[in-house]
Amino acid sequence: MKPRVRSEFVKSGYVFAKSPADIAKEYGFTEVAMLGSNENPYPPSDKVLRAAEAELSGVNRYPDPKAAAFHAALRTYICDCPVVTSGLGMDGVIETVIRTIVEPGDKVVISTPTFSMYGLAAKAASARVVNVSRSADFSVDLDTFLNEAKDARLSFLCTPNNPTGTVTPVEDIEYILDRIEGVLFLDCAYVEFSDINYLPLLSRDNLIIGRTMSKVYGLAGLRIGYAFVPEWLEAPYNIAATPFTMNRLSEAAASVAVSDAAYRESFIAHVQKWRDVFMQEIPFPVYPSGSNFILINVAPQKGDAAAESLAKHGVLVRSCTSFPGLGDTFIRVSVGADWENERFLAAVKKL
């Protein structure tokens, strides 16, 4: 008898960080330093919260299917070009792009180690997934990547990369775009924490730039992803997407958040300050990062063991053993609130 469930969904899926509630209960903490999911530790600004609250009385009605207010805000404050959205974060954008472009058996290339959703979503679409390893310093080896990506239907590259923090230079992206037959999805979820700007490359018709409201804008709980796309993709994407890609609260909050430069710049400065402190004070090899997190090699310890040891001190970090091609001696730590960062530094020095 043929199995009732597809094989892609039997073995494994997305790996979540350990629950803060579980750590608190297990080790007796009233507060846990939540540094495992690359979140913004601070709530949105009051004006963002007020915008969301104002929509509560209208939730009996469906939201705007075109998310016009949010799109207008993005074009005003970020980039005046075609944009698409998803109410399921960057994950939803990735899944919809794949649904729009990729047919069963098509080749999808992924620069690894990286965010697992590219591969999971591509396999769910019955694509032929090819992982291309980065160099020892986690930079992209252009020739190695292009050897596979040149004839791929769709390729994924994350910059700054999750979980390594590596920033790929603009000229390297241009080099890739000039030499591929298909489309490059550039995941820029963390780009605001770097000093790099890929938006001028959007004149290319084979580039998608994905971004999110979850990180610098502090709206992870609302699950808002968006992408700047070539004109030819905008209409097909919207046909392939699920109806109502944003709810009323998320559109209202996001529309105000993108205009709140003071909030954004304040958090970026906070991240950059603590990122430098982490680089200086962590007593293990760390890697340069253009993001709101740091990758740490805790060898000879294993990543799982180090994460568990830190949990005993009330600190939640991400063990990176689930990232293919990375090895089992790495952990990733996000920049949190001051007290969280201080607790982490005290704990990591005891490993």
Curated annotation (Swiss-Prot):
Keywords: Amino-acid biosynthesis, Aminotransferase, Histidine biosynthesis, Pyridoxal phosphate, Transferase
Metabolic or biological pathway: Amino-acid biosynthesis; L-histidine biosynthesis; L-histidine from 5-phospho-alpha-D-ribose 1-diphosphate: step 7/9
Protein name as catalogued: Histidinol-phosphate aminotransferase
EC numbers: 2.6.1.9
First-level EC class: transferase
Catalytic activity: L-histidinol phosphate + 2-oxoglutarate = 3-(imidazol-4-yl)-2-oxopropyl phosphate + L-glutamate
Gene Ontology MF terms in the entry: histidinol-phosphate transaminase activity; pyridoxal phosphate binding
Record-listed N6-(pyridoxal phosphate)lysine modification sites: 215
InterPro entries referenced in this protein's UniProt entry, alphabetically: Aminotransferase_I/II_large, HisP_aminotrans, PyrdxlP-dep_Trfase, PyrdxlP-dep_Trfase_major, PyrdxlP-dep_Trfase_small
Record-stated family: Belongs to the class-II pyridoxal-phosphate-dependent aminotransferase family. Histidinol-phosphate aminotransferase subfamily.
Cofactor(s) named in the record: pyridoxal 5'-phosphate
GO biological process entries: L-histidine biosynthetic process
One protein family per Pfam: Aminotran_1_2
